[in-house]
């Protein structure tokens, strides 16, 4: 008995709180094992002996990790030994504590809830030490601690963590501000947490949070802008706090005071908040449970899971605010795959409906509804994802019949929020809601809006409100049909949906270091790649979809098989019994004999061979043979089969070289259409053209799959018959474009955009073929270029440059390239750097793009200026380049770009550069009219890029100022430059002379003449002298020899000007001696 007690006592963990029924998992065993192993090795050793022994042991990777975790265990469980143990770690660790940080990150993400009170306090202590000593990657641990600071939780345990993290951020503010992502996460988290700390007992903490958050927002607003629209939603909840009220005033009335690039509240509302910030407001454990509910629980079996979730996370009054966080996460992060959409797993809208309908707090309920429709208000079909608006319409659509209260409250809220959310931009909000509803109908997320908007179960006031707000989607009153539910149609079109991510976010574990979900062997990136194509096939008549928010176990589901007439008016039917009706079986239509047999075989066998056989018969069929009903029957069934036979995932080949994979990837019926078009280019009859048009319109991926097919088909055919050349036929693609009645350039860009979003690897693989076969469209095409630049990484750029160097790919031609560069100035920095890499790979001469030099601004176009400066370094100065450079606007502090170019040219060809600039300056002062500036003629084409005299003098003056310790001023001592400066002086007015007095002082004068004293033009070089200048010399400087003098109007002690004076004086002596010798 005693042995059993000792054995059980030995297993009591100091790190984790365990009950009698808890089993240790891998993480817990790993920490316990490492601690025991370390204790066995260092028991009875002095500090020196321990360090010596451990230093030898940690050379091996496994032992190093074990010892590091053992020390971490001691720090977390023994506060008294923590400082000494931390010193021991710093002596023993050989990887900058990387192993300790990684394991601590894992511990916080997976086991924080099970840590003892002592361990949680020690965790804060060690984090403070890590931040204090700038340990690498400690921000990963901090970020996961922020995730553990849950919303809607005012327990002592949670408040301790919140306040501890806040103290670390305040104390080490400089460290925090150096990590923009952590700045964003902390601001987003604390603005959300402040909402929960309204209790008077929490006012000191709340005030500290407010002071820190407001300070960080104002100081780092450039980092706050990417938080986007959900940050605005959180700010609304704390707007009555005085400090936030002042912030709101600045955002609305004085946005530039926060940051020069900030344009106001609409700027934030147009930015979609990253999934990472929505994720950081959910506890990791809560996130795993939510993923399980949305990916593994069948419809009808969810009630017990929802009850457990309710008891676990919604038990307190403060926890109601958590519902908004959950809804935003479900909408923006959990995007089910096609397989899940087709399965009997509980859909997203049902979970959201349960969260809203079970909320009893009116404020939390309003916030939850706003969370549901938030993306509707700013929806842009070009860049937003239909999966973010799909749950809102589906929860209303599936509730209207049997639970109209849910639908009516949501519809009322949508109508009112559209008008009142942002009155100043009501038209833009309405446009967002209109775009949402239009796309919902276009993609057939629901068949139509009549059952929802025109339901008799809505009260009259609400129906009038709907008509007022959504008149485009409501039929006139006089024409309202008797039955407002969808009628039965014999021909069904497939339903299309877009997803942000086709991969299923169903994992139970989270890789906290990289912020990605891990599902078994794969990882799901949180990088947003919206608008990928995903399909929901039409449901068969054999299967039903159950639409419920919750359900009681053991309930008899046979009631759901009643006919429509028995359930339409059943207002008492609970939400748990809501179901979709069965889809009607399409009625068969008799077809002409010429195609009836082949079409029947195709519908039955659904393979590429039977499809091509039908196309052969159908292609020559005249329009008079088919009526509209028959044609629609053929089209709808054809499109449905083509869609269903395409694989929902892995549409493309797994290998780019192995024939079996390549051939398999184009073996589906849709590719049979492409093969048929490839082999039959003759003009087809009208029914065939109509069929082709409908396929292209309903299957948006048709275009890029055709491009993929031609690449594979040509590759395979060439391998089979190397003697015959197989062409990448652009005429086939033109047929597709003609069928959709769009220009080929527009179609090509659209299809390649879809392809890149679907599969970047295949897009880059096809790129050389696209530029080769569609060269007139693709080369210098900025839209196609932008698609490429947004998806490439360093390796992709390298591969593209290889193709360019080998002559396989040409992206640019010299004519028109400058327009591409102009448009690229608005691109992201990385995209612009990649662009310049590709330009350099094409060996584009500078003369083709040099005209853009005067247009570039130092503050707005640093990327282009950086690369152009490198190109200039490889060029010799020419009159044209110098003219363009000096045409650039000279700011108050000068133009560093021009100065840099002049300096490195001075080192190589100083005299040539001096002559070019002098010639340009002299040309501004014609000798025939010394007192009059030359004006460019009205018909001069180069007038706009020709620098004025003031431009040239400005750049020369700023260049002079940049010459420290005399380096580079040799530019001014050459004869032509001296004469040019003297000429400029003699033709300048008094203000110009005063402005550039130091520059003019670098011009030497003759013994016999002086500029400014005589207006005539003598033989020698002239020196500008002012009356005041002669009085500025030191009284001690009395030696006025016959040597040429130089005059300085400011800072006579400057080393650069002393050097210049000395050098110019020497040059003047040499010239004088040469003249005397010649005499």
Swiss-Prot record:
Residues 938-949 have a biased composition (Low complexity). Transmembrane segments: none annotated. Residues 539-574, 925-949, 1010-1079 are annotated as: Disordered. The keyword Lyase does not apply. GO terms for cellular component: cytoplasm; nucleus. Keywords: Cytoplasm, Nucleus, Phosphoprotein. InterPro entries: HEAT_Ints3_C, INTS3, INTS3_N. It is found in: Nucleus; Cytoplasm. Residues 1062-1073 have a biased composition (Basic residues). The modification Phosphoserine is found at residues 1049-1050, 1054-1055. Its main location: nucleus. Component of the integrator complex, a multiprotein complex that terminates RNA polymerase II (Pol II) transcription in the promoter-proximal region of genes. The integrator complex provides a quality checkpoint during transcription elongation by driving premature transcription termination of transcripts that are unfavorably configured for transcriptional elongation: the complex terminates transcription by (1) catalyzing dephosphorylation of the C-terminal domain (CTD) of Pol II subunit Polr2A/Rbp1 and Spt5, and (2) degrading the exiting nascent RNA transcript via endonuclease activity. Belongs to the multiprotein complex Integrator, at least composed of IntS1, IntS2, IntS3, IntS4, omd/IntS5, IntS6, defl/IntS7, IntS8, IntS9, IntS10, IntS11, IntS12, asun/IntS13, IntS14 and IntS15. The core complex associates with protein phosphatase 2A subunits mts/PP2A and Pp2A-29B, to form the Integrator-PP2A (INTAC) complex. This is Integrator complex subunit 3 homolog. It comes from Drosophila virilis (Fruit fly). The gene is IntS3.
């Amino acid at each position: 008995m005693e042995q059993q007690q000792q054995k059980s006592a030995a297993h009591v963990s100091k790190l984790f709180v365990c009950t009698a029924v808890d089993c240790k998992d891998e993480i817990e065993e790993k920490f316990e094992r490492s601690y025991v192993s370390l204790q066995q090795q260092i028991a009875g050793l002095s500090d020196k002996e321990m360090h010596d022994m451990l230093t030898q042991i940690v050379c091996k990777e496994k032992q190093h990790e074990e010892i590091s975790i053992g020390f971490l265990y001691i720090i977390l469980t023994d506060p008294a030994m923590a400082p000494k143990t931390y010193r021991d770690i710093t002596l023993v660790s050989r990887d900058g504590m990387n192993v300790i940080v990684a394991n601590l990150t894992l511990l916080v993400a997976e086991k924080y809830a099970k840590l003892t009170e002592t361990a949680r306090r020690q965790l804060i202590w060690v984090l403070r030490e890590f931040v204090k000593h700038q340990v690498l990657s400690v921000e990963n641990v901090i970020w996961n601690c922020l995730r553990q600071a849950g919303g809607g939780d005012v327990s002592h345990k949670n408040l301790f963590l919140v306040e501890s993290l806040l103290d670390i951020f305040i104390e080490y503010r400089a460290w925090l501000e150096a990590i923009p992502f952590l700045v964003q996460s902390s601001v987003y988290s604390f603005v959300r947490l402040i909402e929960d700390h309204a209790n008077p007992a929490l006012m000191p903490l709340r005030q500290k949070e407010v002071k820190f958050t407001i300070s960080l927002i104002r100081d780092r607003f450039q980092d706050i802008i990417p938080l986007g629209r959900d940050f605005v939603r959180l700010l609304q909840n704390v707007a009555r706090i005085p400090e936030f009220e002042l912030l709101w005033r600045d955002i609305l009335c004085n946005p530039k005071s926060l940051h020069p690039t900030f344009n106001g509240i609409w700027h934030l509302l147009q930015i979609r908040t990253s999934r990472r910030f929505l994720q950081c407001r959910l506890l990791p454990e809560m996130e795993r449970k939510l993923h399980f509910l949305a990916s593994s629980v069948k419809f009808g079996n969810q009630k017990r899971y929802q009850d457990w979730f309710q008891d676990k996370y919604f038990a307190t009054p403060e926890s109601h605010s958590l519902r908004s966080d959950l809804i935003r996460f479900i909408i923006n992060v959990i995007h089910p795959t096609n397989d899940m959409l087709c399965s009997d797993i509980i859909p997203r809208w049902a979970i959201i409906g349960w969260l809203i309908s079970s909320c009893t707090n009116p404020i939390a309920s309003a916030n939850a509804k706003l969370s549901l429709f938030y993306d509707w208000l700013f929806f842009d079909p070009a860049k937003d994802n239909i999966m973010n608006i799909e749950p809102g319409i589906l929860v209303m659509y599936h509730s209207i019949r049997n639970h109209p209260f849910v639908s009516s409250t949501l519809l009322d809220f949508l109508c009112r929020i559209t008008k009142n959310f942002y009155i100043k931009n009501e038209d833009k909000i309405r446009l967002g809601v209109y775009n949402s509803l239009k796309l919902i109908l276009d993609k057939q997320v629901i068949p139509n809006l009549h059952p929802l908007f025109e339901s008799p179960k809505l009260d009259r006031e609400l129906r009038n409100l709907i008509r007022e707000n959504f008149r485009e989607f409501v039929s006139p009153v006089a024409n309202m049909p008797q039955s407002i539910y969808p009628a039965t149609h014999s021909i069904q079109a497939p339903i299309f949906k877009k997803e942000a991510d086709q991969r299923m976010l169903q994992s139970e574990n989270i890789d906290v270091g990289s912020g990605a979900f891990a599902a078994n062997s794969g990882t799901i990136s949180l990088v947003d790649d919206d608008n990928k194509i995903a399909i929901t096939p039409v449901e068969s008549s054999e299967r039903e979809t159950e639409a419920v928010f919750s359900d009681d176990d053991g309930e008899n589901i046979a009631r759901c098989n009643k006919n429509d007439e028995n359930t339409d008016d059943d207002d008492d039917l609970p939400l748990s019994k809501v179901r979709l009706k069965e889809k009607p079986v399409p009625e068969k239509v008799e077809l002409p004999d010429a195609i009836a047999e082949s079409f029947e075989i195709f519908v039955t066998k659904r393979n590429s061979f039977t499809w091509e056989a039908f196309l052969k018969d159908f292609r020559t069929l005249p329009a008079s043979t088919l009526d509209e009903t028959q044609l629609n029957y053929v089209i709808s069934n054809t499109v449905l089969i083509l869609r269903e036979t395409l694989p929902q995932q892995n549409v493309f080949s797994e290998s780019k070289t192995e024939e079996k994979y390549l051939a398999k990837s184009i073996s589906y019926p849709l590719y049979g259409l492409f093969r048929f078009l490839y082999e039959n280019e003759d003009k087809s009859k009208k029914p065939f053209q109509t069929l082709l048009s409908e396929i292209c319109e309903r299957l948006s991926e048709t275009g890029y799959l055709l491009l993929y097919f031609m690449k594979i088909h040509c590759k395979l055919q060439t391998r089979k018959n190397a003697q015959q050349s197989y062409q990448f036929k652009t005429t086939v693609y033109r047929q597709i474009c003609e069928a959709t009645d769009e220009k080929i350039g527009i179609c090509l860009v659209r299809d390649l955009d879809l392809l890149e979003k679907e599969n970047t690897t295949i897009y880059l693989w096809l790129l050389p073929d696209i530029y080769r076969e569609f060269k007139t469209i693709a080369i210098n095409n900025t839209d196609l270029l932008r698609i490429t630049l947004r998806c490439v990484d360093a390796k992709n750029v390298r591969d593209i440059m290889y193709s360019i160097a080998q002559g396989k790919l040409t992206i640019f031609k010299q004519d028109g390239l400058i327009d591409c560069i102009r448009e690229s100035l608005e691109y992201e920095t990385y995209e612009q750097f990649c662009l310049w890499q590709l330009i350099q790979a094409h060996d584009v001469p500078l003369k083709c793009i040099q005209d853009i030099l005067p247009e570039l601004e130092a503050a707005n176009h640093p990327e282009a200026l950086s690369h152009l400066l490198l190109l200039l370094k490889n060029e010799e100065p020419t009159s044209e380049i110098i003219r363009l450079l000096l045409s650039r606007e000279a700011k108050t502090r000068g133009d560093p770009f021009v100065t840099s170019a002049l300096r490195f040219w001075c080192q190589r060809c100083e005299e040539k550069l001096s002559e070019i600039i002098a010639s340009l300056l002299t040309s501004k002062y014609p000798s025939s009219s010394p007192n009059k500036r030359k004006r460019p003629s009205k018909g001069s084409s180069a007038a706009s890029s020709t620098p004025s005299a003031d431009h040239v003098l400005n750049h020369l003056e700023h260049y002079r100022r940049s010459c420290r310790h005399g380096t580079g001023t040799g530019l001014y001592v050459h004869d032509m430059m001296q004469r040019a400066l003297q000429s400029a002086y003699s033709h300048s007015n008094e203000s110009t002379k005063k402005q550039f007095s130091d520059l003019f002082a670098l011009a030497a004068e003759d013994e016999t003449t002086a500029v400014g004293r005589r207006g005539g033009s003598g033989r020698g070089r002239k020196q500008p002298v002012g009356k005041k200048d002669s009085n500025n010399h030191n009284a001690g400087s009395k030696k006025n020899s016959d040597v040429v003098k130089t005059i300085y109007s400011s800072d006579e002690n400057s080393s650069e000007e002393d050097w210049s004076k000395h050098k110019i004086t020497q040059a003047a002596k040499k010239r004088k001696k040469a003249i005397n010798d010649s005499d």
